[in-house]
Amino acid sequence: MNTLLAVDGSDNSYAAVHALQYFARAEQLTLLHALDVRRPAYPMVPPEVAGVHNTTLDQSVREDGERLLDRVQSLLPMHAGPSTKQLRIGFPAEVIVWMAKERKADLIVMGARVMGAQGLGPVKEWLLGSVSHRILTQAPCATLIVNGPVKAMKQILLPLQGLSDAEAAIRFLQLKPFHDAVEVTLLTVLPSTGPPRPGDAAAAAAATEKLEEQAAFIDGVAERLRAIGYQAHGVAVTGTPADMILQEATTLRSDLILMGTRGRQGITRFVLGSVAHAVLHKMPCPVLAFH
């Protein structure tokens, strides 16, 4: 598996570095730091003097970036795989997406780039930064967003919205991305339309039949995962998809949510599916998003 680790020196970025200990040895590991160098304007300074200032600034930023990459390389787990360092200038999201394509990456790993957090309860809302959003929607491969220290990688929650979602998840899991064995809980949520009216036996029977169909679907996917070496079982519930995913992740104390980024109706390449969007803004643990 080819892995691209994008770093920026933030706490979440270092958490992403440490999270690599839970992933399989990479055939090729690229350490990338993208420099978004914005030169200040000097309207009252002669051009030749401003040029000297800009050159000094560029050199200082590059040296800082090289030191960051050296430190990251020193923190890699022993089994991380052969690594190379890349220091590039440009808008981070564009550089990361381009590098992922150039290196034919199977996985991008990065810390959550957030604008801030809202909410006073146990589940805060993360305002996903534009860099994270663009990478999630435009990257050619799966992306792991790490939102804090990762202490384990055993319990994986895999929400599925349909057959295409399941096929994409299986393709990714066939890469055997994890270092140690994991337990996968597959979850499918039948959107709630409200309880049947009292005495409406036909509506109640129809709702039960739909839930049984979803249970059969998720059990079938779990069986396919077991066939390729995973511990897996399925759960089918009724409710609001994003809420049920977050609830299940909290109940199971999931170490990772593995999910698709697009809705069932073919959300465009530049817009996250509504369920993925909601989960990413309140993620209780790292999220690994696949296409």
What are these regions, as identified by a protein language model?
Residues 143, 281-291:
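Short, flexible loop segments at boundaries between secondary-structure elements
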Residues 128-149:
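Short, structured interface segments
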Residues 33, 112-113, 188, 260-262, ...:
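Short secondary-structure boundary segments
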Residues 51-67, 204-216:
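A short acidic, glycine-rich active-site loop
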